[in-house]
């Protein structure tokens, strides 16, 4: 077997904690390599193509692009920084020969930095560390270098990985430098470091073909598109190849490659053939899935598929049966819901979907609340109407039959005066304080290990307790023996007593009991939750009640009644809020929280039984 290097290619992934600037860095590499015309209007974070990615400023799906520097084509993959989308990170790292780790010059190494770095080190990939945002006034690049080296040591990096080059950059200002004290002029130091530090792909172009499919794209004209790296051999348009299923290698089928693409800038460019080291997109194969291998017809040997981290959290997705069901959504039936959820499995390897004992509900398991909430938001925008239950963690059993539960590392930055309240709340939720440091600017960093179920519903409380000044980052740590019962929400719900339209007078009386979620003029139904009670129990309130009229007293003006602005819940806040006997109703226009049992008498009977 004659192994050869493709010195004209480098394959590199950019990995980072959420919001440390990697997508902006890719934008700058695209601009400075001449992908865009000089006068072309370019959107910020051009790699984040999905609406939710642009709105939230996070990357959810791994993206492929390529730039040419000198005579070398650099294939760049921008990966998600959040552990909930770790399935994406783990897969795409199989396509590359090195990684650029982007770390914020102020925040330093964070929980997700550890997560993505662990995955890269496990595959023995060389690392280039890019300390980004060095132009921030509070930047501390020298300390951040030490933090990254400590993290590499902690994660048992090899000697080669420990000897990683450091680049100091401001992606926003468009420069990089090899010295933290010297401001650069362009991105040349980073380009040069990629060429010198990331090895050229190696393989035998005459050997039997092997292409591992790492991502699936979809185009309504050509259907499913498989994306992967040519590990050995050569793939050709109109050539016959063997598709080997990663679940069952005995499942093999002969297929034809109708179109073949390589990446150039943000575009896919049609090519006739591709050989070792090339990252290609292949269309014309209807049954292609993530993890499958395209092989030589006469020598169909599959590449082992990277085992993806298991889900830790589950929710039920349920057909909406509220009194307002079907009035705002386009896709509302059980068939619609089932088809959409199972379709998601084609592109999301971290997701699990199971049928339940009723055709109206499906159990959906994912890597965390963000993972599932992004799916919910996508479905909502597509016109789906459905309900979801409170998230629940997925337990495991040890060898002796004991219960194991998932725990997370939480790193929290709060102003000093709020640290006591945070420690108290997390301790109640079975959190263990592992480390506490205070810096000169009056901020305390707390490091906790806490059960995943202890974090469900906590983020809303955290924002209240820290007056919106706290930052919490979490990362899955592993499974430990069950830590015992946790007492949850200390406040009950305000429940609408009757179906109708809310009025100022009814809301004015209800707001004395707690915090409202709705304004006057909103349609409500009996059993719908319209606010949070100040006390622990649930209370029924009549928000449709108008002022009683009499001969001696006119109704007066409702304008004289002053209502506090309602608390409008985001999707994540609403998911955090619901209890086990409640559901979140989701339509393209509205989020409504409701009791599972809408009838008040039936609800009382059920609570007595429990």
Where are the regions a protein language model picked out?
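Structural and coupling elements of P-loop NTPases
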Residues: 1-610
């Amino acid at each position: 077997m004659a192994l050869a290097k493709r010195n004209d290619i480098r394959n590199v992934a950019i990995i980072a904690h959420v919001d440390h600037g990697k997508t902006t860095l890719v934008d700058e590499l695209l601009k400075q390599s001449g992908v865009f015309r000089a006068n072309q209007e370019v959107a910020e974070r051009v790699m984040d193509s999905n609406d939710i990615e642009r709105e939230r400023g996070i990357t959810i799906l791994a993206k492929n692009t390529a730039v040419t520097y000198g005579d070398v084509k650099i294939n760049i993959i921008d990966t998600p920084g959040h552990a909930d989308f770790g399935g994406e990170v783990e897969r795409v790292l199989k396509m590359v020969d090195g990684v650029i780790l982007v770390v914020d010059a102020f925040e330093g190494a964070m929980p997700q930095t550890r997560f993505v770095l662990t995955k890269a080190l496990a595959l023995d990939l060389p690392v280039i560390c890019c300390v980004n945002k060095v132009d921030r006034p509070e930047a501390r690049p020298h300390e951040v270098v030490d933090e990254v080296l400590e993290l590499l040591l902690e994660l048992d990096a090899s000697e080669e990985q420990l000897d990683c080059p450091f680049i100091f950059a401001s992606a926003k200002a468009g420069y990089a430098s090899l010295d933290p004290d010297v401001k650069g002029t362009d991105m040349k130091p980073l380009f040069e470091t990629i060429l010198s530090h990331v090895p050229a792909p190696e393989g035998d172009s005459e050997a039997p073909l092997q292409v591992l499919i790492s991502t699936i794209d979809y185009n309504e004209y050509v259907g499913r598109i498989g994306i992967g790296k040519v590990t050995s051999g050569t793939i050709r348009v109109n050539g016959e190849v063997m598709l080997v299923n990663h679940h069952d290698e005995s499942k093999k089928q002969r297929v034809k490659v109708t179109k073949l693409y390589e990446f150039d800038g943000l575009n896919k460019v049609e090519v006739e053939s591709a050989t070792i080291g090339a990252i290609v997109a292949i269309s014309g194969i209807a049954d292609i899935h993530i993890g499958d291998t395209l092989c030589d017809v006469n020598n169909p040997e599959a590449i082992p598929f990277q085992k993806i981290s298991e889900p830790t959290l589950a929710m039920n997705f349920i057909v909406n049966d509220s009194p307002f069901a079907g009035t705002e959504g386009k896709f509302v039936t059980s068939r619609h819901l089932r088809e959409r959820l199972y379709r998601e499995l084609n592109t999301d390897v971290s997701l699990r979907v199971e049928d339940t004992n009723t055709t109206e509900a499906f159990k959906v398991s994912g890597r965390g609340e963000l993972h599932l909430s992004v799916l919910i938001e996508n479905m909502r925008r597509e016109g789906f109407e459905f309900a979801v239950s409170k998230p629940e963690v997925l337990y495991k059993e040890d060898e002796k039959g004991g219960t194991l539960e998932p725990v997370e590392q939480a790193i929290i930055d709060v102003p000093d005066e709020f640290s006591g309240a945070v420690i108290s709340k997390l301790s109640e939720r079975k959190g263990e304080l592992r480390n506490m440091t205070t810096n000169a600017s009056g901020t305390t960093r707390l490091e906790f290990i806490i059960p995943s179920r202890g974090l469900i519903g906590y983020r809303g409380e955290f924002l209240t307790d820290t007056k919106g000044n706290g930052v919490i980052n979490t990362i899955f740590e592993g499974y430990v023996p069950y830590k015992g019962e946790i007492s949850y929400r200390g406040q009950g719900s305000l429940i609408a007593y009757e179906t109708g339209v809310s009025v100022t007078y009814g809301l004015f009386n209800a707001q004395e009991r707690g915090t409202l979620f709705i304004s006057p003029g909103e349609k409500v139904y009996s059993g719908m939750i319209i606010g949070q009670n100040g006390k622990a129990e649930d209370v029924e309130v009549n928000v449709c009640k108008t002022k009683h009229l009499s001969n001696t007293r006119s109704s007066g003006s409702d304008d004289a009644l002053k209502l506090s602005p309602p608390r409008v819940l985001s999707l994540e806040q609403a998911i955090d809020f619901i209890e086990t006997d409640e559901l979140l109703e989701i339509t393209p226009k509205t989020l409504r929280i409701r009791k599972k049992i809408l009838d008040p008498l039936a609800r009382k009977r059920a609570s007595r039984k429990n």
